[in-house]
Amino acid sequence: MMELEGEKPNYGEPRKYDPTFKGPIYNRGCTDIVCCIFFIICILGYVAVGILAWSQGDPRKVIYPTDSRGQFCGQAGTPLETKPLLFYFNIMKCASPMVLLEFQCPTTQMCVEKCPDKFMTLLKAYANKEDFKYYKNFCKEGLEGLTVTQILSSGLCPAMLTPSKPFTRRCFPALDQKKGGEITVGNNSKFDDGEGNIRDAKDLVAGVKNATVVIEARQVVMKIFEDYTQSWYWILIGLVIAMLISLLFIVLLRFLAGIMVWVMIVMVILVIGYGIFHCSMEYVSLKSEAGSNVTLKDLGFQTDFSVYLHIRQTWLAFIIILAIVEVVIILLLIFLRNRILIAIALIKEASRAIGYVMSALFYPLFTFALLSIVIAYWAVTAVFLSTSNQPIYKVFNDTACDHSRKICEPANFSTSSMKAECPDSKCLFAFYGGETVYHKYLIGLQFYNVFLFFWCANFVTALGQMTLAGAFASYYWALVKPDDMPAFPIFSSLGRSLRYHTGSLAFGSLILSIIQIIRVLLEYIDHKLQGTQNKCTKFLLCCLKCCFWCLEKFIKFINRNAYIMVAIYGKNFCTSAKDAFFLLMRNMIRVAVLDKVTDFLLFLGKLLIVGLVGIFAFFFFSGRVKAFENTAPNLHYYWVPILTVVVGSYLIAHGFFSVYAMCVDTLFLCFLEDLERNDGSAERPYLMSDRLLKVLNKKNKPEPAE
């Protein structure tokens, strides 16, 4: 095969032959000590933030609805334990625009055992002993001896009750729409508001709409949560299947690398082809169904995502996307057919290396465990930080009042000057906040939590990359395998990485984290400016997002290769990054031909596993296989477990294939150095395998006869 020679512009001097070099250097010192110390200080600060958040936060604010006194409805061990639902005295006041600003209706709210199920006014209920007994379930205490007028003026009871249903632990009027568009509540289109006025049921719509706008998304979240509770067992089975397929694939790749790569290529084409066929059949079958020709634009956003599967345009979009992917893959395979042979040789060599370092296959489990700890710590800290505010009470009034929306204290509000100047006003719970130093810098603590999450997650990933790189480099540079390799390559490499190079790992992950935080901020700004019509701003923001996306990919590439050089030579991060970059630039053509084609083949492997498990999950959860029709759980959205299984399968496959990818990258960098250090002579023989020598049209010259 034709030799692949890369151009060698001025990117530093090629590596010179060193007879003492035997692979990863053992006599090394600590690198990037300043960054190591800074990282440790930041971790200690992160622990302090967590302790502070846990001491101030209260997750009950997320779980339970809160009444006008700031008490939690339905909380165990409190007087409100048996009253889990929140009841609004006058739901129509929720039509105020203030609801959208402060997420709070300007009406009294109290915890109740169950929602009202009948029409009733205080005036009529007061005259009937049984009715008034029922009515008092929705009133405050202290009604004895008071007249109807006194009760209403004191705000102890609502003027009326309407039939309601619980929704996200809140009582909302049981509105219904009959044929012709007539709105009813409790089968009535008119009702008495308790103040002598006959109101239309449509008047309740605005209040309910505004009251639910803040929690509308929670309906979807709650349904998704219910789906998870119904399907978690089957999701785990799907993920276990993905893990077993990934493990089987890796084992087969170890012994049958060449055959498995070609089988993988053919299978990917067939799986995507089947996807196109299935989508086409669905598209044709919907032709005769009424309403299936509605466009996605006309349909708009629907919380019930299964609606989209009854639209022909959805399946047409799937067909187009899959067809494009199929064509792109086939074209790449045609144009890269010769390069694929070289990449297969590199994968075979990686398989051989993994055969000597079998423990590397299980290292992703260690990385996964560390990442789980990081994610769990971040999530718990975020919840406690977001719930560490104190209840804030504000003045609410139906009429004009100078003190409206001002902060008040419910304990002494009845005797305050605010109440005297605004007799109709009420001091109600508004939201959670605070004026202390802690609350003033709360947003800073939340930002610190997010930033340290990115930094720690990237550090864990970097540790895995350097550990695997050190283990596989010790394999490559061993003259006699496995005699010249450490007894436990993974543990030896992990120990070196933590003992000497924590600073370098922290430095590289810090750079990447800063870029990721900037990308998050750009996404946040983009979300806030969605309504703007300034095209220049949109264009600038789009350019910045694109540039930082490219920069993140570049930094990940540099970091990955820098960690390999640190693992081998034990130099600091910047020097290693420069050496790796120059080495790759001196061999640009080989990088494009070998490394990237190999990455493409490994990506096809991940795609195959995701496709197989995804197809199985689709037919199971959608109930399209009669054998499993009664076994599959009944779900609101069957795409929830399908999507979870697909994403989880990709992450699992990525975890297993990341070992191969890191092995390939390490061997690739090592054999580039091998080509520069050695020339194949008896004094300077190549250390790469005979298979790679043959692919690259290189050979070691025999020792001269004596």
From Swiss-Prot:
Side Extracellular, residues: 54-232, 278-315, 386-454, 526-599, 660-706
Top-level taxonomic group: Eukaryota
Keyword Transmembrane helix included in the entry's annotation: yes
Annotated signal peptide: none
Topology feature Cytoplasmic, residues: 1-32, 254-256, 337-364, 478-504, 621-638
Entry's localization field: Cell membrane; Mitochondrion outer membrane
GO molecular function, one term: choline transmembrane transporter activity
Pfam families in the record: Choline_transpo
InterPro entries: Choline_transptr-like (IPR007603)
Keywords, alphabetical: Antiport, Cell membrane, Glycoprotein, Membrane, Mitochondrion, Mitochondrion outer membrane, Phosphoprotein, Transmembrane, Transmembrane helix, Transport
Recorded catalytic activity of this chain's protein: choline(out) + n H(+)(in) = choline(in) + n H(+)(out); ethanolamine(out) + n H(+)(in) = ethanolamine(in) + n H(+)(out)
Membrane topology: Multi-pass membrane protein
Residues glycosylated per entry: 187, 210, 293, 397, 412
Bilayer-crossing regions: 33-53, 233-253, 257-277, 316-336, 365-385, 455-477, 505-525, 600-620, 639-659
Biological role: Choline/H+ antiporter, mainly in mitochodria. Also acts as a low-affinity ethanolamine/H+ antiporter, regulating the supply of extracellular ethanolamine (Etn) for the CDP-Etn pathway, redistribute intracellular Etn and balance the CDP-Cho and CDP-Etn arms of the Kennedy pathway.
Family: Belongs to the CTL (choline transporter-like) family.
Protein name: Choline transporter-like protein 2
Organism phylogeny: Eukaryota, Metazoa, Chordata, Craniata, Vertebrata
